[in-house]
C-alpha cells in the first residue's frame, strides 16, 4: 500500500482553485495511478478532515518546442476534494 504522501503530490494554486476554496473544495496534483478511495483516505489522514467527495481528471501534457526540437510534458492527474460542512479548513491554504 502506498503512503498518503506518495498519493498527494502537491496542491495546485491557481485563480480557479482559490475560488473553489470558498466552497471548501481543494485542488491537488495526485499520483496518476491513484483512485478516488485512495485519494480520500490520504487527504483524511494527512490533514485530519472529513471528505465529502472526490472528483478526478486526467490532464494531458502539452507539446512544447525548443527551437527545432519538440517534446511533450508528462500527463498528470488532478483531484478536486470537497470537504464536509462541519469539517475544518485545510490550514495549508489559509492566507493565500
UniProtKB/Swiss-Prot annotation:
Gene Ontology terms: biological process: translation
Top-level lineage group: Bacteria
GO terms for MF: rRNA binding; structural constituent of ribosome
GO cellular component: ribonucleoprotein complex; ribosome
Coiled coil spans: none
Keywords attached to this entry: Ribonucleoprotein, Ribosomal protein, RNA-binding, rRNA-binding
Oligomer and partners: Part of the 50S ribosomal subunit. Contacts protein L29, and trigger factor when it is bound to the ribosome.
Similarity section: Belongs to the universal ribosomal protein uL23 family.
Function text: One of the early assembly proteins it binds 23S rRNA. One of the proteins that surrounds the polypeptide exit tunnel on the outside of the ribosome. Forms the main docking site for trigger factor binding to the ribosome.
Protein's recorded name: Large ribosomal subunit protein uL23
Organism phylogeny: Bacteria, Bacillati, Bacillota, Tissierellia, Tissierellales
Chain's gene name: rplW
Amino acid at each position: 500500500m502506498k503512503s498518503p504522501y506518495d498519493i498527494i503530490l502537491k496542491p495546485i494554486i491557481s485563480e480557479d482553485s482559490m475560488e473553489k476554496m470558498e466552497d471548501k473544495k481543494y485542488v491537488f496534483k495526485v499520483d496518476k495511478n491513484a483512485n478516488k478511495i485512495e485519494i480520500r483516505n490520504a487527504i483524511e489522514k494527512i490533514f485530519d478532515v472529513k471528505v465529502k467527495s472526490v472528483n478526478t481528471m486526467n490532464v494531458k501534457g502539452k507539446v512544447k518546442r525548443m527551437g527545432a526540437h519538440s517534446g511533450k510534458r508528462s500527463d498528470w492527474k488532478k483531484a478536486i476534494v470537497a470537504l464536509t460542512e462541519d469539517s475544518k479548513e485545510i490550514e495549508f491554504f489559509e492566507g493565500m
